[in-house]
C-alpha cells in the first residue's frame, strides 16, 4: 500500500511539474508591468541621515538626548544614531517604535491610544512584538510607505520625529490626539 502511494505521488508530482512548465508563459510579466514589479520604493540613506540630523537638532533645542532609528519598509536598519547619555532601554525602544509602525502601518501613538484602556489588547499587541508607545511614525511619500522612524529617550519623541519629517520630507498628516486614561471608579 505504501509503495503504491509513493509511486502515485511521484507520478502526480511529475505530471504537475511538466504541466506547470507548459503554462509558464501565462505568468510572465513584461513591459511596464515588469518595471513596476521590479521597482522598490524605500527610503535612502541620505534622506535617513537628514531625518536623523533634524531630529537631533530638535532634541538639542529641547535639552534632550535621543536615539533615532530609520527602518526600510521590510524592517532593515537604514540609519541609526544614538546621542550621548542614552541608556540601553532608550536605544531598544526607539527601534521597537519604528518596527511597530511597520507592523501596523500606523503611528505607534495611534496604537497607544488603541490599547490605552484595554489590557487584553495590550497583551495581544505585546505578544506580536508591537510597542504601543508614542515616538514611531511612518515615512510616507506620494502615498507610499517608504520606511519608519522611531525615536526614544526623550519626553517629546513623537514631536521630534514629526518635526524631522516635516522639515525634510514636507507636510505630514496630523498627529493623533492623546487618549486620556479611563476614569478610575471612586472606592466605595
Give, region by region, the residue ranges found by the protein language model:
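Sec/Tat signal peptide C-region and signal peptidase I cleavage site
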Residues: 17-21
Amino acid at each position: 500500500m505504501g509503495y503504491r502511494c509513493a509511486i502515485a505521488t511521484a507520478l502526480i508530482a511529475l505530471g504537475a511539474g511538466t504541466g506547470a512548465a507548459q503554462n509558464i508563459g501565462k505568468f510572465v510579466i513584461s513591459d511596464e508591468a515588469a518595471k513596476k514589479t521590479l521597482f522598490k520604493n524605500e527610503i535612502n540613506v541620505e534622506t535617513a541621515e537628514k531625518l536623523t540630523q533634524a531630529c537631533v537638532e530638535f532634541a538639542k533645542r529641547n535639552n534632550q538626548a535621543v536615539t533615532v532609528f530609520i527602518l526600510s519598509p521590510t524592517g532593515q536598519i537604514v540609519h541609526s544614531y544614538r546621542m550621548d547619555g542614552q541608556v540601553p532601554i532608550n536605544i531598544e525602544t526607539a527601534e521597537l517604535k519604528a518596527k511597530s509602525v511597520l507592523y501596523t502601518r500606523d503611528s505607534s501613538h495611534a496604537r497607544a491610544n488603541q490599547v490605552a484602556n484595554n489590557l487584553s489588547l495590550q497583551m495581544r499587541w505585546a505578544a506580536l512584538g508591537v510597542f504601543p508607545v508614542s515616538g514611531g511614525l511612518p515615512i510616507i511619500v506620494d502615498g507610499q510607505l517608504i520606511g519608519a522612524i522611531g525615536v526614544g529617550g526623550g519626553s517629546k519623541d513623537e514631536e521630534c520625529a514629526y518635526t524631522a519629517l516635516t522639515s525634510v520630507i514636507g507636510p505630514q498628516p496630523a498627529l493623533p490626539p492623546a487618549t486620556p486614561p479611563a476614569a478610575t471608579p471612586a472606592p466605595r
